[in-house]
Amino acid sequence: MSEFDPNPPRRNFYGRRHGKTLRQSQKGYLSEDLGSLRPRGITVQENPERKPVAPSTIFGDDRPVWLEVGFGGGEHMVHMAARYPEIGIIGCEPFINGVAMLLGKIRAAGVENVSVHPGDARDLMDVLPDASIDKAFLNYPDPWPKARHHRRRFVTPEHLIPLARVMKPGAEFRVATDIPDYVRQTLEEVPQAGFDLVAEGPQAWEDWPSTRYEQKALREGRVPHYVTFRRRS
């Protein structure tokens, strides 16, 4: 098992880890850039005792820290990092093609306030201290459309309870999706995990960049939906 294997045997993971063959440039990003951007002590192999990993050890100071779960191709994460250079942003993504795409965007944009965990967000949340995250994002997550797979969605207690634990009281949690049933489940499950609904509807946030997933939804006639929660005090 390699040092970067994000699939610990203690936990099920659903979904793809690899897609189409990576370009040589993307392979270069992974071999040259990921090592310096990857937070240490997240995987079970590196941290079997699951000792806490403070965000200040990741970014080297006590700046506010945001978390993006499943950053896809990285458009949103890099946009936010460039717009808010005083913030540290940790992104989690187990799909290696998405990680490679993000690394290319990071290199092109020259942003330095990012950290990339190429694995399951649950492994990161396992070791983050209580109330250590100032804002979190879940943008166009895997919809798992079949009813028997709905419990694999991120908006379930298995994911939301750990997320609530690591978020500061009053911290904002944003969800973007174009799947009506995902909106339904989000509105049902997230408040039960300790969040209050702030806003929901088709109007995007002021600092939202249009992503390739959003553009695909619009081309195919689906209406994007944006939901904002706040961590209950």
Curated annotation (Swiss-Prot):
Protein's pathway: tRNA modification; N(7)-methylguanine-tRNA biosynthesis
PANTHER family: 3-DEOXY-D-MANNO-OCTULOSONIC-ACID TRANSFERASE/TRNA GUANINE-N 7 - -METHYLTRANSFERASE, PENTACOTRIPEPTIDE-REPEAT REGION OF PRORP DOMAIN-CONTAINING PROTEIN
Active site location: D142
Coiled coil (residue ranges): none
Protein name in UniProt: tRNA (guanine-N(7)-)-methyltransferase
Residues involved in S-adenosyl-L-methionine binding: E68, E93, D120, D142
Sequence positions that bind substrate: K146, D178, T211, R212, Y213, E214
Key words of the record: Methyltransferase, S-adenosyl-L-methionine, Transferase, tRNA processing
Source organism of the structure: Paracoccus denitrificans (strain Pd 1222)
Annotated gene: trmB
Superkingdom of source: Bacteria
Molecular function GO labels: tRNA (guanine(46)-N7)-methyltransferase activity
Enzyme Commission code(s) on record: 2.1.1.33
Pfam families referenced in this protein's UniProt entry, alphabetically: Methyltransf_4 (PF02390)
Function: Catalyzes the formation of N(7)-methylguanine at position 46 (m7G46) in tRNA.
Gene Ontology CC terms: tRNA methyltransferase complex
Family: Belongs to the class I-like SAM-binding methyltransferase superfamily. TrmB family.
Stretches the record annotates as Disordered: 1-36
InterPro entries: SAM-dependent_MTases_sf, tRNA_(Gua-N-7)_MeTrfase_Trmb, tRNA_methyltr_TrmB_bact
Catalytic reaction(s) noted: guanosine(46) in tRNA + S-adenosyl-L-methionine = N(7)-methylguanosine(46) in tRNA + S-adenosyl-L-homocysteine
